[in-house]
């Protein structure tokens, strides 16, 4: 069947997959709901016409992210940039290629169900960087699971530019596997955790300073008055003052981060669907772990450490529900795929040992 790339049923489902860009922008919601789409489409159109980036002085901190995303998506073989939805077809294309590659390892009937998660259908149907982040993250995690040394580093470079926070969490997994032999035994993982804890304690002031910068920025962005609306007392109340406070806040808020929006917070049908999906995703992760008996695997433990680090960090700075539902999916989806791939990898290793 793999000589045909995909089977007939999958082919039919992908017809729907490629049509979904026509269902969201201007149909289910105003494209300004995901306003960053305009940055990527305008930049990609300019790059195609002039082979040089636009001046993005007005978007401090966005320049490199926008330009690199637009270069990659804008030069894929898709039709001309005729609307804000145009780059969505590039996102669909890279995820089709991703599916074909993954189907070599993961059964198609399981994989296609994962590709029909509502959030994946949504984000690949828009002109966003999110699918590109997930694309690079998945290849990074899988190549690291294969214990390749150079390819993951090459994939990490664009991630550092496009989404540096996620690149940080992913790099933890690379360090665990390559430098602490996290694929062989749990001993290296314990050593890594002890060293990491010691470094955080040693540089706790700098660590808390960085976390508070992100925490305050997202809190102010979500406030009615925006930036500049907080007085000194409000800023102090939001700031985390100690490592103990950081861990208490991250652990207690992690449930909110993983399950937001709760059904009673749903302002519309879209939020209600995301609330249900969050439960499905958590259930799916536990199902894969249990059915694949991954809890015996040091590689799984290494994956889990990097994932938990990402969840805890985001939990501390999560204020805007819409923004962090999006961040959560982009963080979790590559790990779901990696867990599925690891099941295949462990089964293959078991069969090899039995021969």
Predicted regions and their residues:
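Short acidic/glycine- and proline-prone juxtamembrane loop motifs at membrane-interface regions
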Residues: 125-132
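Transmembrane and membrane-interface helices of multi-pass
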Residues: 95-96, 111-120
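Transmembrane-helix motifs of polytopic, lipid-linked glycan transferases
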Residues: 74-75, 86-107, 283-287
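Alpha-helical transmembrane segments and terminal signal-anchor/GPI-anchor hydrophobic tails
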Residues: 25-41, 163, 169-292
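Membrane-interface helix-loop-helix junctions at transmembrane boundaries of multi-pass membrane enzymes
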Residues: 107, 146, 285-306
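Start-transfer (signal-anchor) and selected internal transmembrane alpha helices
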Residues: 1-22
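Short hydrophobic/aromatic helix or loop-helix immediately within or flanking a transmembrane segment
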Residues: 36-82, 252-253, 257-258
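Membrane-interface transmembrane helices that cradle and orient dolichyl/undecaprenyl
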Residues: 106-108, 138-151
């Amino acid at each position: 069947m793999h000589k045909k790339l995909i089977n007939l049923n999958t082919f039919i489902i992908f017809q729907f997959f490629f049509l979904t860009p026509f269902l969201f922008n201007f149909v289910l919601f105003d494209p300004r709901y995901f306003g960053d789409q305009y940055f990527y489409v305008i930049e990609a159109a300019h790059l195609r016409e002039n082979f040089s980036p636009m001046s993005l002085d007005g978007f401090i901190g966005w320049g490199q992210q926008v330009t690199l995303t637009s270069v990659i998506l804008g030069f894929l073989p898709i039709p001309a940039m005729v609307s804000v939805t145009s780059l969505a077809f590039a996102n669909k294309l890279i995820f089709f290629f991703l599916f074909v590659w993954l189907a070599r390892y993961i059964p198609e009937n399981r994989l296609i169900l994962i590709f029909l998660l509502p959030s994946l259908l949504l984000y690949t149907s828009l002109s966003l960087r999110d699918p590109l982040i997930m694309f690079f993250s998945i290849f990074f995690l899988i190549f690291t699971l294969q214990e390749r040394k150079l390819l993951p580093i090459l994939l990490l470079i664009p991630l550092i530019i496009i989404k540096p926070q996620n690149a940080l969490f992913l790099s933890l997994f690379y360090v665990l596997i390559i430098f602490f032999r996290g694929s062989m035994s749990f001993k290296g993982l314990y050593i890594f955790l002890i060293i990491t804890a010691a470094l955080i304690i040693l540089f706790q002031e700098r660590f808390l300073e960085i976390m508070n910068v992100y925490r305050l920025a997202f809190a102010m962005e979500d406030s009615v008055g925006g930036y500049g609306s907080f007085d000194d007392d409000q800023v102090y109340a939001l700031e985390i003052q100690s490592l103990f406070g950081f861990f208490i806040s991250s652990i207690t808020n992690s449930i909110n981060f993983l399950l937001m929006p709760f059904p009673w917070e749903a302002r519309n049908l879209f939020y209600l669907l995301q609330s249900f999906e969050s439960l499905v995703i958590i259930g799916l992760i536990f199902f894969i772990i249990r059915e694949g008996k991954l809890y015996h695997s040091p590689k799984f433990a290494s994956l889990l450490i990097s994932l938990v680090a990402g969840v805890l960090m985001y939990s501390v700075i999560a204020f805007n529900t819409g923004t962090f539902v999006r961040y959560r999916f982009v963080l979790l989806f590559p790990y779901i795929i990696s867990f599925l791939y690891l099941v295949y990898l462990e089964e293959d290793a078991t069969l090899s040992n039995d021969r």
